């Protein structure tokens, strides 16, 4: 299930584009997540009151959280699968405090792929999409394993 060196290079190359505007990309990812899967919004007390896409686009808190999400994910991706130290506290908080089901990690992975496709079509062709999908699946599988260790079956 691991990625080849070439696949990791594709992932990290496109991630460099994301890092040029983490907050903007993160905001778009969260907006897409909430639009495609409105039930996910219920997990975010801070954002439950945001009903329209315009309200979401105008929310500094949403932009800040998008930055936080993609910053954490970037730190994990840069470890090229050797992300145990980064993953453990993330899994702990998402399982015990926030109670985010693994299914929602799939939903946000889809949103990330969609945002990258729309914002970076020239840098996110089929090979890069395949590599990113594999990297995000590895992340989700490892999060799910940590959840299980913590006794969370979300």
Swiss-Prot record:
It catalyses: Fe(III)-heme b-[protein] + nitric oxide + H2O = Fe(II)-heme b-[protein] + nitrite + 2 H(+); H2O2 + AH2 = A + 2 H2O. PROSITE patterns: GLOBIN. The modification Phosphoserine is found at residue 4. Heme b binds at residue 94. InterPro entries: Globin, Globin-like_sf, Myoglobin. Belongs to the globin family. Monomeric heme protein which primary function is to store oxygen and facilitate its diffusion within muscle tissues. Reversibly binds oxygen through a pentacoordinated heme iron and enables its timely and efficient release as needed during periods of heightened demand. Depending on the oxidative conditions of tissues and cells, and in addition to its ability to bind oxygen, it also has a nitrite reductase activity whereby it regulates the production of bioactive nitric oxide. PANTHER family: MYOGLOBIN. This is Myoglobin. It comes from Ochotona curzoniae (Black-lipped pika).
């Amino acid at each position: 299930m691991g990625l080849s060196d070439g696949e990791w290079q594709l992932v990290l190359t496109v991630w460099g584009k994301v890092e040029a505007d983490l907050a903007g990309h993160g905001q778009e990812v969260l907006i897409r997540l909430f639009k495609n899967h409105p039930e996910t919004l219920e997990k975010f007390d801070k954002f439950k009151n945001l009903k329209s896409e315009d309200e979401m686009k105008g929310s500094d808190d949403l932009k800040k959280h998008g930055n936080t999400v993609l910053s954490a994910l970037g730190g994990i991706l840069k470890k090229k699968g050797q992300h145990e130290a980064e993953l453990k506290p993330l899994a702990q908080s998402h399982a015990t405090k926030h109670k985010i089901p693994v299914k929602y990690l799939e939903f946000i992975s889809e949103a990330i792929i969609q945002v990258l496709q729309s914002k970076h079509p020239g840098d996110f062709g089929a090979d890069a999409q395949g590599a990113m999908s594999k990297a995000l699946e590895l992340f989700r599988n490892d999060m799910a394993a940590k959840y299980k260790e913590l006794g969370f079956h979300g």
